[in-house]
């Protein structure tokens, strides 16, 4: 569009400027809205690529570090760090370990039996749970209150689960995790903000995952960093052999095996 010169003798007043400003704002809004839509689509494509890659692996062996932040009764933010390993053979075998400053725990699932091995307490418990690893994750969450934030990454419907209730998605840019270049994505829903760093290139491995709880005062975070990612698992990885010195007990009798020591946090106070 060709702009014509202004020849009016009167200075351009506020009333004349207002339509110009509104027009500029409208153009900017359309531009920013289009960029946001493109960003959202790009973020979803990258998550879908990661999901397809991860679910395509029939066996997995990964090592990880995790950080969980809690808020004390004095509104002090404290972080607890653990390390561990996850071995998976789809559809129904899982071994996971978590070692921190307060707990050393292992779970083993062979498709029929779940074993929770409390190395600190020198005891273990077993319950019959027939089904897939995904059904196991549901049983642990619904019946025993065990919630593993990073467990979403193991599900075959990981894309649908992670994108459920997402209201905003964006590609932030690039990042480097342990020397590996990654695509940095950010997502929002009503209760949490979460970020993920996915390895760039032919192997879109999730390298870092951060969940921020917006509904809790001080917005504590959970961070998962995947260190090693392999696709081979030893055949006997899902066979549990009890330490002869350990005592077998009922699962309900087992002491607290959470990675956060009892008495550290107050009840989650809503904003």
Q: Where in this protein do the model-derived segments appear?
A:
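Conserved short hydrophobic patches within well-ordered secondary structure
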Residues: 13, 54, 197-198
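N-terminal mature ectodomain segment of secretory-pathway/periplasmic proteins
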Residues: 41-123
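A short, polar/proline- and glycine-enriched secondary-structure boundary/capping micro-motif
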Residues: 73, 105-109, 118, 126-129, ...
């Amino acid at each position: 569009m060709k702009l014509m010169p202004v020849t009016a003798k009167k200075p351009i007043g506020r009333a004349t400027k207002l339509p110009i400003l509104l027009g500029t704002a409208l153009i900017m809004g359309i531009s920013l809205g289009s960029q946001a839509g493109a960003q959202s689509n790009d973020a979803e494509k990258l998550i879908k690529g990661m999901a397809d890659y991860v679910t395509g692996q029939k066996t997995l062996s990964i090592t990880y570090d995790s950080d969980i932040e809690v808020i004390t009764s004095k509104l002090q933010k404290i972080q607890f760090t653990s390390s561990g390993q996850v071995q998976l053979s789809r559809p129904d075998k899982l071994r996971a370990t978590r070692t921190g400053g307060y707990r050393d725990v292992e779970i083993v699932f062979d498709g029929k039996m779940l074993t929770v091995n409390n190395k600190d307490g020198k005891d273990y418990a077993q319950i019959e749970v027939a089904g897939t690893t995904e059904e196991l994750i549901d049983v642990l969450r619904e019946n025993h209150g065990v919630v593993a934030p990073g467990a979403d990454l193991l599900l075959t419907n990981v894309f649908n689960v992670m994108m459920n209730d997402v209201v905003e998605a964006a590609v932030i840019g690039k990042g480097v995790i342990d020397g590996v270049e990654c695509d940095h994505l950010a997502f929002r829903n009503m209760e949490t903000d979460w970020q993920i760093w996915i390895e760039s290139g032919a192997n879109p491995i999730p390298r870092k995952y951060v969940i921020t709880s917006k509904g809790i005062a001080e917005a504590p975070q959970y961070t998962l960093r995947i260190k090693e990612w392999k696709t081979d698992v030893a055949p006997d990885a899902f066979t549990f052999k009890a330490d002869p010195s350990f005592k077998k007990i009922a699962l309900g009798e087992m002491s607290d095996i959470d990675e956060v020591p009892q008495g550290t946090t107050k009840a989650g106070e809503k904003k």
